[in-house]
Curated annotation (Swiss-Prot):
It comes from Serratia proteamaculans (strain 568). Belongs to the DHBP synthase family. GO terms for molecular function: 3,4-dihydroxy-2-butanone-4-phosphate synthase activity; magnesium ion binding; manganese ion binding. InterPro entries: DHBP_synth_RibB-like_a/b_dom, DHBP_synthase_RibB. It is an enzyme of class 4 (lyase). This is 3,4-dihydroxy-2-butanone 4-phosphate synthase. The gene is ribB. D-ribulose 5-phosphate binds at residues 37-38, 42, 150-154, 174. HAMAP family: RibB. Its EC number is 4.1.99.12. Its cofactor is Mg(2+); Mn(2+).
């Protein structure tokens, strides 16, 4: 990643720490993955704090595929089968079946309805019957070990919200341009500045975790 593009958001360490602070303050962050991977920017929010306004922003400026990142433990708690048994996607993106809140929604498509579904799925006492299948929210199962085991947006989301002090559940959606094409670093940075969001890379997060875990060992 061209570090000059990201210089307005601080050093790699500062970018991670600013992202954690933003999440703690109920704001979203933008996460860029590696240029030789998807080379895309995702909007990321803590599931516990996401607002209807933030969901509306996500739907308006994103791909429309609003994903709920979960751990394997939560997937099992909710009894969510994986979408396919043989995952042949390029980056092994681990979708489960889609979900909808069993109560409190209409068609399930609106920002309010999608947020109701997310809140139902991440509630401490959530049970399988709280969710209908299929629906308009796309759960993603994160790999154990986070970005140190897979350098994906799913794992970055779980790492960031956990490090910020929230339960390991976060919402992501890929940022798109007005013409429907995928947003890359220059467009992601412009969007972040327009919406007072900080930007970091998965590479930043990998280095941050490695440094802190080496200190702890």
């Amino acid at each position: 990643m061209n570090q000059t593009l990201l210089s307005d958001f601080g050093t790699p360490v500062e970018r991670v720490e600013r992202a954690l602070e933003a999440l703690r303050n109920g704001r979203g962050v933008m996460v860029l993955d590696d240029e030789n991977r998807e080379n895309e920017g995702d909007m990321i929010f803590a599931a516990e704090t996401m607002t209807v306004e933030q969901m509306a922003l996500t739907i308006r400026h994103g791909s429309g595929i609003v994903c709920l990142c979960l751990t394997e433990e939560r997937r099992q708690q909710l009894e969510l089968p994986m979408m396919v048994t043989n995952n042949s996607s390029q980056f092994q993106t681990a979708f489960t079946v889609t979900i909808e809140a069993a109560q409190g929604v209409t068609t399930g498509v609106s920002a309010s309805d999608r947020l109701t579904t997310i809140r139902a799925a991440v509630a401490d006492n959530a049970k399988p019957s709280d969710l209908n299948r299929p629906g308009h929210v796309f759960p993603l199962r994160a790999q154990p070990g986070g970005v140190l085991s897979r350098r994906g947006h799913t794992e970055a989301t779980i790492d960031l919200v956990s490090m910020a002090g929230f339960k390991p559940a976060g919402v992501l959606c890929e940022l798109t341009n007005d013409d429907g094409s995928m947003a890359h670093a220059p467009e992601v940075i412009l969007f972040a500045k327009q919406h007072d969001m900080t930007v970091l890379t998965i590479e930043d997060l990998v280095a941050y975790r490695q440094a802190h875990e080496q200190k702890a060992s």
